[in-house]
Design a protein with these regions (language model features):
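Pyridoxal 5′-phosphate
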Residues: 1-164
Length: 164
């Protein structure tokens, strides 16, 4: 029987030649089980309402513009997936540094108190297409401040300097 949904730990390997599923029961358990939905619905709706605040929107835009301009100005960094003209609209940045392994960079950033996603992002064929073994993904949320954005960029610069 073939799973009707995909994602998360239910897949062992994805390639152009096919997909290998995890053994049972994981094969049919795509993603994380959503047992927190009911008690978290009210706070989620409150956060959505809060995100309409013009000051918060301005702060998000400022953070995103700063992070994008800082990453794109660094010749050591290769950014993926940010179409031209949308720089201030995204808050998720996928990137790699030529000559630096993504896991090494993620470990150093972790020691600096920065959480990033490292790996193939469940997209092995895309990594092959880009000619990379993996990348990092940094995400920013409405609660992130300019101070945190500056700390991320300065820490990333320091971590790259340690590895190059």
């Amino acid at each position: 029987m073939v799973p009707y949904q995909g994602g998360g730990e239910m897949i062992e390997l994805v390639s152009f030649s096919g997909t290998t599923y995890a053994p049972l029961p994981e094969k049919f358990e795509a993603g994380t089980q959503n047992f927190n939905s009911v008690p978290s619905l009210k706070p989620a709706l409150e956060i959505l309402e809060m995100m309409k605040d013009p000051e918060l929107v301005a702060q998000c835009n400022e953070v995103n513009e700063y992070v994008y301009s800082s990453l794109s100005a660094d010749p050591r960094i290769r950014i993926f997936g940010v179409p031209r003209g949308t720089e201030s609209k995204t808050s998720i940045y996928s990137f790699c540094v030529d000559g630096v392994h993504h896991e090494d960079l993620a470990l150093i950033l972790d020691k600096m108190g920065i959480a990033v996603r490292s790996g193939q992002m469940c997209a092995e064929p895309l990594m092959d297409r880009f000619g990379v073994t993996g990348m990092l993904r940094a995400s920013f949320a409405p609660y992130n401040t300019m101070e945190e954005a500056r700390y991320f960029i300065s820490s990333l610069d320091k971590a790259i300097g340690m590895l190059k």
